[in-house]
Amino acid sequence: VEDHKLPRVSVSLTLDRPPIDETQKPGMYYLTSELMGGGSKNISKEAFVEETDRMGATVYLTIDGGNTYSLTRYFPRVLELFAEAALHPNFTQAELDKARDKAIASLKAEENSAQSIIYRLNSALTYGKKHPYGSFYTEESLKSITLSDVSNFYKTYFSPANAYMVVVGDVN
């Protein structure tokens, strides 16, 4: 969609795929999404972040798709980086460990939140533990997820053949 009012471009990527069943390994969605968008097999996380920051661009990816925003003059390069990160993510053990530690810290913080406890209890009672809405990750389930699990999860659910991309902004 062309819109030349401002010199910027936005891209949204959405995947049309079957629902994700996390009941076997709760936390896969979260950990895989946390590892996406931070570089690729060809561009280190540090170089990726430095380049997108230098251009003032935003690149955000999850297992569901993602989005990116940039000034028009940087759009071709930002789109290259977005595609590179989406199609060739670099899942490393160090990044998996960081994401896992972050999730566990969040779980521990939620232990004292009445709102979080009520939400989990209500969902579990309403849907049951075999339903995706009634299943939650735990410290144990997070610790059981391996780098191979994350890679296989990505390969199963992130497919360009099922992707829709919308580009809006100062483009021809």
Q: Predicted segment positions?
A:
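Acidic/histidine-enriched segments that form metal/cofactor-coordinating
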Residues: 49-153
